[in-house]
Amino acid sequence: MRTMRWAGSLCGAAVCALLAAGCGNSSWHSLPAPQVTSVSVTVNPASITTAQTSQATATVEGIGNYSSAVTWTVSGTAGGTVSTTGLYTPATTGTATITATSTEDTTKSGSAQVTVTAVPATITVSPTTATIGTTQQFTATVSGLSSQAVTWSVAGPSGWTGSIGSISSTGLYMTPYPAPATVTVTATSVSNTSVSGSATVTLEAPATTTGPALTVDATDQLHAINPLIYGMNGYTITNNDVTQGNIPLVRWGGDATSRYNYQTNVTNSASDWYFENGQGSGGMPGAGNFTGFVSAVHSLGAEPLGTVPVLGWVSNSNASACSFPVATYPGQQSVDPYSGLCGNGVYPDGTNGCTSSGGCNIPGGSAEQARTSIAEPPPASSAATMPAASAATTSWAQSTWTGGWVNSLVTNASYGPASGGTGVNIWDLDNEPAWWDAVHRDVHPLPSTYDEVTYGGISTALAIKTIDPSAQVSGPVIDYWWNYFYSKQDIENGWGHGPCYQPWDDPTDREAHGGVPMIEYYLQQFAAAQTTYGMRLLDYVDIHGYDSATYNGASVGFATAGDTGEQEARINSTRALWDPTYTDPNLPQPNYLTDSNYTTSCNVPLQAPQLVPMLRKWVASDYPGTKTAIDEYNWGGLESINGALTQADVLGIFGQYGLDLGALWGAPTTSQVPGLMAFEIYRNYDGHDATFGDTALASCSGTAAASCDATGTNATAQNQLAVYGAVRSTDNALTVVVINKTYGALTSTLSLEGVTATGAAAVYQYSNANLNAIVAEASVPVTAPSGGASTISYTFPAQSITLFVVPQ
């Protein structure tokens, strides 16, 4: 405001001049000097963050023709700058005093205060959707913090008890299946853990797409499907498992059966549980007593498979003894939490001279042997100690430990020979000999050899067959990849020799046996023994197939389903059983110096394991007519639909590729209903013991019908929609199992080559929609043949097993 004060009337300059001329001596008052009287400042806003600005406005008051111009300055802890127009930009947090000083009168100024706070730290997470069965990369936008580093976490909705997937340290999210409608993905600041941001992420099912074409050729019958492929191990099995799953075989096997004493019903748990003797073999049908087991299994309509010792030791009569009592060996690494009397036979690091971080084994020896066991060596341990054919009499067999055991059953009217229907049908020649010096190190501290396993097995089998010619024998019951090709002695030799510290570095045992791989040597010697003794002594070549994939450094076998990455690894690794294109970093080629692809490099190439075709190839080459068995395996996830699909795939592969006997280790518990349903789809799909067919048919996914048999199934397509077909001899029905391994529905056409049936096919289905039952769905039409094949078009739900029963 400009204010001018006058003593008389106000007038313009011209008027005043006239007045002055006509008024004589009237007075004239001059204009006042410019004067600034005050400067005031306002700021908007008065509170800002370090990322904002505040506009300051100055109001200058005075009199006269003064200037309203000001200069701006800032002071205070917030620092910063003020532009010539009064725009304040802070430097840091605190308070800032914004001052405007008049240029007319620098003694006149005004101020206002601005409060500056830190930018509220925020984290924004994106995106807000993810597709089930895929990975989704999440990003975190961090504001208000100097560091962009975050940690990631994921949480499910309230009440959700299933998997929520997993998220990596970089924000890569692996979706779950089954999946909740949403999950919450959270990013938390590393520099300030009180700051986080979340996104509610909708999990969307993939759209229905077209799946690979499927073919089952009814004119191409491959082989009979042995029902014994649907077996289980007896440990933890329930009557419901056997009856509901219509399980045809139950095995008495595992570590705790190797040293079973049939005379006293005492066995030893070995390293599985503090090397303790105990009454019977716990967890088995028949209250742990072997004869009770045989009766119980027969009463359930299944065949019993027993285990006889070859390692040379059985438990003594002291049912409370243990090999490493705490009183004798105080300070052990671990002690039985129930009794407190027995240890695990390991001294911890730093005690008793142990300098190993994992602890040091207390050596097994005569004292440990005497505490729990008695020596019962097999009849022979080398070719030189095998009995002559003329000496292999009934009395000779009865004098052996195993022969005496078999004789006690054969001569008991309650059991009798295998052929009588109430005896023991099949005998395993011990269990996992490559682990004897670890699991049974208290009595068998040295690694097993070619001769010990082979001739101990042949002589034991000879005793069995001499007493009960109708019984069948299975061996060598060897587990894991390297043990198929080398003895345990070779493997441990290799561990101690460079340059690679692998079995091929010092395989002296294999070299002493003509360089022949362990199992092939075993078969060859049994074939020779048949010539010597005039009877087949080995009916099944038997391995354990723990060949599921590893995921994040751990085996998926025995594990719960996990996220979809783990699930895919699990179901993909069933290809180890058959696929010539599948390799696993844990399964390199055996690399013996006479192998065609032998390499001196330690980076040995991988080899497709093809476990079932490999077994059949060995048999064809070394002992034709021998059947094949995998009587322990476990792919895990049995509590989930993923485990059910994987188990169903395993059983389909067993039938399709001609395995003769299989037994799941770890029968499904009450919380693992899906695992049992995988057996039921083949053995009891209608609740009345209706079964999958008993003659395998050429079946292909993603392969043209005309080349299905010659080319085989396409591995990529089989990993989307697996197909297994068989004809059932009782009614000539065509049965087809289709497994949708993907997370979205797939629509495909199933061509039934050589099938002229029309009408409808019955449909039975198992999926996540109902994990407690196989559901009979509406029947589907079978389209009349066109070009030689009837067809069925069907949309297979995500993660499902579908069984078609086509009458012919």
How does the language model describe each region?
Residues S459, A463, A527-Q530, T599-T669, ...:
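Catalytic-core region of carbohydrate-active enzymes that cleave or remodel glycosidic bonds
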Residues T716-G759, Y766, Q799-T802:
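Carbohydrate-binding surface patches
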